Amino acid sequence: MKAMEGKIIQVLGPVVDVEFESYLPAIFEALDINFEVNGTQKALVLEVAAHLGGNRVRAIAMDMTEGLVRNQAVKARGKMIEVPVGEEVLGRIFNVVGESIDNLEPLKPSLTWPIHRKAPSFEQQSTKTEMFETGIKVIDLLAPYSKGGKVGLFGGAGVGKTVIIMELIHNVAYKHNGYSVFAGVGERTREGNDLYFEMKEGGVLDKVALCYGQMNEPPGARNRIAFTGLTMAEYFRDEKGLDVLMFIDNIFRYAQSGAEMSALLGRIPSAVGYQPTLAGEMGKLQERIASTKNGSITSVQAVYVPADDLTDPAPASVFAHLDATTVLNRKIAEKGIYPAVDPLDSTSRILSPQMIGEKHYEIATGIQQVLQKYKDLQDIIAILGLDELSEEDKKTVERARKIEKFLSQPFFVAEVFTGSPGKYVTLQETLEGFGGILEGKYDHIPENAFYMVGSIQEVLEKAKNMKNS
């Protein structure tokens, strides 16, 4: 196989040019370099990104290129980067090339799949829209997720993005008996570490595969890690027929790493310095996240919005693909209401009577109207006080405050911190509770009884206990 060997002719940071004698590796083919740095052996994987003419290729490094020199030997693999798939990946942490990085016994995979795969064809895709029950009241009621849909999770630091992600992983594991895949794209190493140990404590680790391409890694690793995670999720969908949850944190970093590579590959930048292929790259990733006749991949993607500018090309390219948005609000978190989901800002494509039914739609819009009216009355209350409101408005305010409190919920994964047992609330129970509040059935119950409980039954029990004590 001497023909498949080449040599380095140029190193430009994470981009390496390689020349072969008589062989030309295909685009996306993996190349291996084994070399020594300061007495330690290193194995580096490159991925072919462009043909430069002759038998020269330009490749992207999946790890640091320190220690590479010209004329060093490179070996073509004859195939793409392949990563382990199957149940053995659960509970483990992987890097972009599928090596386990959790200091446990190295995984000897029985099955590997290439990370670049075709999106499901039109014939394979499932067209029926089905709601995906999360067991989280505020999401199921006001911004429901669809099976195989894509959800954007917007929120600043410390408002509870990670906790919602962990709760979703927990609920999928225990209520739907499903698996989750978490791809940390350009994540802080500390956050990835915290997530691993929190999942271990929360008891959900054996139902999730973790793939990390951290902030300190070269752009190739940060970009391709999304495909590594997605490939693992696709196996569970296509071969096991499961409904999988795929988390990407953060999708903005995927676009950002593509921009870093694009300039080095010699492409002329487009708007705001992003790569000219931004929309195509985003589409390539997002189109693989789909429902097929076998199973589905529902994805929750954390979206960082640079300088809070929603028109920035990177977040704008994500919006086109989203079916629902879950917006976390710091003001709600400050009130002590968790999950801190903004009930008026969060949206869903399936929140329509045709998709979720007349009853659910009426209750959801009714709740939003009451909350919006309460928001509009805030200024009057601040200036004149509650007593100056009409009887009708007073009732609205009372109900809105109960709704706000009832949208909070104790989480299973937060039991360690809160001390109160987690609650999974079915859609039926959620609709029954909020429908009753709108009808005025619970006007006589104090608002504190609605705080941090599951179903409306618990509200009644809590109110009874409060009365007795």
From Swiss-Prot:
UniProt xrefs under Pfam families: ATP-synt_ab (PF00006), ATP-synt_ab_N (PF02874), ATP-synt_VA_C (PF22919)
SMART domains per UniProt: AAA (SM00382)
Subcellular localization, as worded in the UniProt entry: Cell inner membrane
Catalyses which reaction(s): ATP + H2O + 4 H(+)(in) = ADP + phosphate + 5 H(+)(out)
Keyword hit for Transport: yes
InterPro entries reported for this sequence: AAA+_ATPase, ATP-synt_VA_C, ATP_synth_F1_bsu, ATPase_a/bsu_AS, ATPase_alpha/beta_chains, ATPase_F1/V1/A1_a/bsu_N, ATPase_F1/V1/A1_a/bsu_N_sf, ATPase_F1/V1/A1_a/bsu_nucl-bd
Leader sequence residues: none
Domain of life: Bacteria
Record-level Gene Ontology MF annotations: ATP binding; ATP hydrolysis activity; proton-transporting ATP synthase activity, rotational mechanism
Cellular component terms (Gene Ontology): plasma membrane; proton-transporting ATP synthase complex
Protein keywords: ATP synthesis, ATP-binding, Cell inner membrane, Cell membrane, CF(1), Hydrogen ion transport, Ion transport, Membrane, Nucleotide-binding, Translocase, Transport
Topological type in the membrane: Peripheral membrane protein
Family according to the record: Belongs to the ATPase alpha/beta chains family.
PANTHER family documented for this protein: ATP SYNTHASE, ATP SYNTHASE SUBUNIT BETA, MITOCHONDRIAL
Name of this protein: ATP synthase subunit beta
Gene: atpD
